[in-house]
Amino acid sequence: MLKFIQNNREITALLAVVLLFVLPGFLDRQYLSVQTLTMVYSSAQILILLAMGATLVMLTRNIDVSVGSITGMCAVLLGMLLNAGYSLPVACVATLLLGLLAGFFNGALVAWLKIPAIVATLGTLGLYRGIMLLWTGGKWIEGLPAELKQLSAPLLLGISAIGWLTIILVAFMAWLLAKTAFGRSFYATGDNLQGARQLGVRTEAIRIVAFSLNGCMAALAGIVFASQIGFILNQTGTGLEMKAIAACVLGGISLLGGSGAIIGAVLGAWFLTQIDSVLVLLRIPAWWNDFIAGLVLLAVLVFDGRLRCALERNLRRQKYARFMTPPPSVKPASSGKKREAA
């Protein structure tokens, strides 16, 4: 049973999402509707994109805590370009390139300069946030064109164009990681760095690609944020990095690298977003959101740690079972045979 749970974390995450959707329905039947699902998905798109990028980094046994700042910086660039008169396609491409460049810089610090990922990205977290504030002067960016907001308008089945793009990206990345040699290189790099090198995997390049794509996903999340809100705050993206990591852990992405799936991270992002909608239904103040999400994350981390320890004990017991088998007992001679011998 323990091995099944460890090997099928996506199923347990899906069950958690289903339960969190069904149980509030007993309080309000209107909650159980397609409209609720589309609303939750619309709210979850930013976190889903960030969780997909974070998955790539975590699979290589690294972590990136700067994605919130990258999201904010890229959203600011998008707003500045649009207000300067550039077309939406040009502004979006420039925004994605900035995210890619920011992620590449993070990857170069980790792969080439051998700086620990948590230290490197803590530094760039402040760097990118500072660039964002320098560009805006600490002010909001408003007056964004209506065509940007159309990206988040319902298009088909209540889902926006950018929502369908997110679904396509999820499917593509799930296929890439599961079915291609390039995708398996991420797992190999995180599972055994030296072994991957001996197999010919270019581990430095893989880590740089992981960070670069993570930055690109953060930039896309910035575009989604701007299109949904319609303006850009001077604190856009603050705290999103922790939620992205939490979504990955909830979905079964190992902090030790080398295991997990994109689908699990997506379900984790959905679960965290759905918590917010349930709290609204229960009329619980919004400042409880982070507290409850933190409790859920701690519970999952404790469960994950206990599960890993239990599996290791079982594997150790199976490995040394033949050395621990007691010797066959020798039956004592019967009293009759003893008398004859006498």
From Swiss-Prot:
TM regions (residue ranges): 14-34, 39-59, 70-90, 93-113, 115-135, 155-175, 213-233, 252-272, 284-304
Keywords associated with the record: Cell inner membrane, Cell membrane, Membrane, Transmembrane, Transmembrane helix, Transport
InterPro entries: ABC_transp_permease
Principal localisation: membrane
Ranges of the Periplasmic topological domain: 1-13, 60-69, 114, 176-212, 273-283
Protein's job: Part of the ABC transporter complex LsrABCD involved in autoinducer 2 (AI-2) import. Probably responsible for the translocation of the substrate across the membrane.
UniProt record similarity statement: Belongs to the binding-protein-dependent transport system permease family. AraH/RbsC subfamily.
Subunit architecture: The complex is composed of two ATP-binding proteins (LsrA), two transmembrane proteins (LsrC and LsrD) and a solute-binding protein (LsrB).
Protein name: Autoinducer 2 import system permease protein LsrC
Species: Shigella flexneri
Phylogenetic lineage: Bacteria, Pseudomonadati, Pseudomonadota, Gammaproteobacteria, Enterobacterales
Gene that this sequence comes from: lsrC
